[in-house]
Regions:
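Interfacial helix-cap and linker-helix signal at transmembrane-aqueous boundaries
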Residues: 39-40, 71-72, 161-166, 246-247, ...
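Intracellular juxtamembrane helix-capping segments at the cytosolic ends
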Residues: 119-134, 323-337
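Short amphipathic helix-loop junctions that connect adjacent transmembrane helices
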Residues: 34-48, 240-256, 367
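C-terminal transmembrane helical hairpin of 12-TM major facilitator-type secondary transporters
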Residues: 282-329
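Hydrophobic core of transmembrane alpha-helices in multi-pass small-molecule transporters
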Residues: 23, 103-121, 311-323
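C-terminal ends and interior cores of transmembrane alpha-helices
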Residues: 86-101, 294-306
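Helix-to-loop junctions at the C-terminal end of transmembrane segments
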Residues: 64-77, 163, 271-284, 366-367
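Helix-loop-helix hairpin linking two adjacent transmembrane segments in secondary transporters
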Residues: 135, 144-195
C-alpha cells in the first residue's frame, strides 16, 4: 500500500476510501439500470410486469434495511459491509444469468438477493459518512454522494456502450460484479471503517435496542425522514425509469436513453461537488427550498413535454434539484452527536425503502396512465412534502460536542475477512 496514503490520519484515509466505495457503487448500479430496456425485452416484460417483479424482489431488502441498525449495533459496520458486498455481488451476477436464461423466476430471485446485499451496504456506508464528517469537523457528506453520482455517470456510459457494442447483459454484469465486489473488500481491509468502541453485540443486544428505536419517536427526526424519503424516491424513480421513459416516450434508442440518465446523474454530480458553497451561502433551509423547486419544475417539464429537447432540459433541472436533498437530510440527522448513528441509520433505512418502492410504484402507475413518462409526475407529491418540511433541516443551536466524541457512539469495526 502507498506510504503516503498510510501516513494520512485515520479519518482522512476512511474519507478517501469511502469516496471510492460510493463511486464504484454508482458504477455498478447504473451500469445495469441503463440495460433495463434490454432486460425488459429479453424477459418479455410489460411495465406492470417489471414493476411487480421489482416489488416482490424488494420484500427481502425491506426486511434487511430495517434490521440493519440492529445488525450494525451487534456486529459493527465492517462485518455488515463485508457481508453486504458478497451478497450484492452474487445477486448482481444472478440478475444477468436470469436474463440470459429468459427466466422471470431467476430474475426475481436475483432482485431479492441483490436488494438484500444493497441494503446491508447502504446503511453502514451512510453511517460511516456521518462519522467521518463529525471527525473532520466540516461538511464532507455531499462529496460522498458526488462520488456516487460520478460513478453513476460512468456506469450509465458503460451500460450505453455495452448496449451499442452488443455485449450480452450476463457478461457485463459478471465482470462489473466481480470487479466492484473485489474493490469493496479491498477498501475495507485498507481502513474504510474508523475504529471505535466495542460493538454492543459483544454484550446483550437489547442494550442498544432502545436507543435505535427511540429516534422513530422524535418529531424532528421523523420530519427529516420525510425529506430523506422524498429525495431517495425522486432519485430512485429516475434511476429505474428515466431511460425507459425516454425510449418509450420519444422513440429513442436504448443507448440514447442511457445517456439521458447520464445527464440526470451528471447534473447531480456537478451540484454535489460545488453544493457545499451554496449551502454556506444560502444555508441549509434556503438550499433545500431552492433544490425542491428546481426538481419539481424539471420533473414537470419532462413529464408534460412533447419535445425531447425540452424534456432533456427538464431532466437536467430535476437532477440538479434532487442532488443536495438527501445529503442535507443526513447532515441534519447527525447534528446532535448523541444518537447520531441511530438517526442516520433511520435516514438510510427510509431512503432504501423509497428506492425500493419507487420502481414498482411507477410501474403500476405507468400501466394505468399511458407509460412511464407521465407516471413519473407522481414524484412531484413527495417533493412537495420535502419542500414543506425544509425548515426542520436548520442546524441545531445547541453547542456541538467534540466530533471525536461521536465516534464513541459508533460500533467497532471487525477486521475484514
Amino acid at each position: 500500500m502507498n506510504r503516503a496514503f498510510l501516513a494520512l490520519a485515520v479519518h482522512e484515509r476512511a474519507r478517501l476510501l469511502l469516496i471510492g466505495v460510493f463511486g464504484i457503487s454508482g458504477v455498478m448500479a447504473f451500469s445495469w439500470l441503463a440495460r433495463i430496456p434490454s432486460i425488459r425485452d429479453q424477459l418479455s416484460l410489460t411495465p406492470a410486469d417489471l414493476g411487480l417483479i421489482l416489488l416482490v424482489g424488494s420484500i427481502g431488502a425491506l426486511v434487511t434495511v430495517f434490521s440493519s441498525p440492529a445488525l450494525l449495533a451487534r456486529f459493527g459496520s465492517a462485518r455488515v459491509f463485508a457481508t453486504g458486498a458478497l451478497v450484492n455481488t452474487a445477486g448482481f451476477m444472478l440478475i444477468g444469468a436470469g436474463t440470459a436464461m429468459g427466466s422471470r423466476w431467476i430474475f426475481g430471485l436475483a432482485i431479492v438477493i441483490n436488494g438484500i446485499g444493497g441494503s446491508l451496504l447502504t446503511v453502514p456506508m451512510n453511517v460511516e459518512s456521518a462519522r467521518i464528517e463529525q471527525a473532520h469537523g466540516r461538511s464532507v457528506i455531499p462529496h460522498f454522494h458526488a462520488a456516487f453520482s460520478a460513478g453513476a455517470v460512468g456506469g450509465s456510459i458503460l451500460g450505453a456502450a455495452a448496449s451499442s457494442a452488443g455485449v450480452p447483459v450476463w457478461l457485463q454484469f459478471a465482470v462489473v460484479a466481480l470487479v466492484v465486489g473485489g474493490l469493496r473488500l479491498a477498501a475495507l481491509r485498507a481502513g474504510l471503517v474508523i475504529p471505535g468502541p466495542a460493538p454492543v453485540g459483544r454484550g446483550p443486544v437489547d442494550q442498544k435496542a432502545p436507543a435505535l428505536m427511540s429516534v422513530w419517536r422524535e418529531p424532528r427526526a421523523i420530519l427529516i425522514g420525510v425529506l430523506a424519503f422524498a429525495a431517495a424516491l425522486s432519485e430512485g424513480a429516475a434511476n429505474n425509469w428515466l431511460s425507459l421513459a425516454f425510449v418509450d416516450g420519444f422513440a429513442s434508442t436504448e443507448a440514447f436513453g442511457g445517456l439521458v440518465l447520464g445527464v440526470f446523474i451528471g447534473t447531480m454530480t456537478i451540484v454535489r461537488v460545488f453544493g457545499s458553497r451554496a449551502i454556506d451561502g444560502l444555508g441549509r433551509v434556503g438550499s433545500l427550498q431552492l433544490s425542491c423547486v428546481l426538481a419539481i419544475a424539471g420533473l414537470a417539464a419532462f413529464g408534460l413535454s412533447g419535445s425531447p429537447q425540452l424534456a432533456l432540459v427538464g431532466v437536467a433541472l430535476w437532477g440538479g434539484g434532487t442532488a443536495l436533498c438527501f445529503p442535507l437530510a443526513v447532515a441534519a440527522a447527525s447534528d446532535e452527536p448523541l444518537g447520531a448513528q441511530a438517526r442516520v441509520s433511520m435516514m438510510a433505512s427510509l431512503a432504501s425503502v423509497a428506492v425500493m418502492t419507487a420502481a414498482p410504484l411507477i410501474g403500476v402507475v405507468a400501466a394505468a396512465f399511458g407509460g412511464p413518462q407521465h407516471a413519473l409526475l407522481i414524484v412531484v407529491v413527495p417533493l412537495l412534502a420535502g419542500l414543506l418540511v425544509a425548515g426542520h433541516v436548520a442546524p441545531l443551536l445547541a453547542p456541538v460536542a467534540d466530533p471525536l466524541l461521536v465516534l464513541a457512539d459508533a460500533p467497532d469495526p471487525v477486521p475484514a475477512v
